[in-house]
Amino acid sequence: MQVVNSLRSAKQRHPDCQLVKRKGRLYVICKSNPRFKAVQGRKKRR
């Protein structure tokens, strides 16, 4: 899963990509091609 600043280009990679909001984070999910998954707003680990 990629962590990106903007999901605009991530949701346009495939026609089946959907934008979903879960627990305050934005996710792009794609059931037909799971390598296009992405997330915005993930907390950084130290």
Curated annotation (Swiss-Prot):
Which InterPro entries does this one have? Ribosomal_bL36, Ribosomal_bL36_sp, Ribosomal_L36_bact
**Source superkingdom:** Bacteria
- The organism's taxonomic lineage, starting at the top: Bacteria, Pseudomonadati, Pseudomonadota, Gammaproteobacteria, Enterobacterales
The similarity comment for this entry is: Belongs to the bacterial ribosomal protein bL36 family.
Keywords noted in UniProt: Ribonucleoprotein, Ribosomal protein
What biological processes does GO assign it?
A: translation
The cross-references to PANTHER family, in alphabetical order and at most eight, read:
50S RIBOSOMAL PROTEIN L36 2 (PTHR47781), LARGE RIBOSOMAL SUBUNIT PROTEIN BL36B (PTHR47781:SF1)
Single GO MF annotation: structural constituent of ribosome
A Pfam family of this chain: Ribosomal_L36
Which Cys-Cys disulphide bridges does the record give?
A: none
Q: Would you tell me the protein name for this molecule?
A: Large ribosomal subunit protein bL36
- Gene Ontology terms, cellular component aspect? ribonucleoprotein complex; ribosome
Q: Which gene encodes it?
A: rpmJ
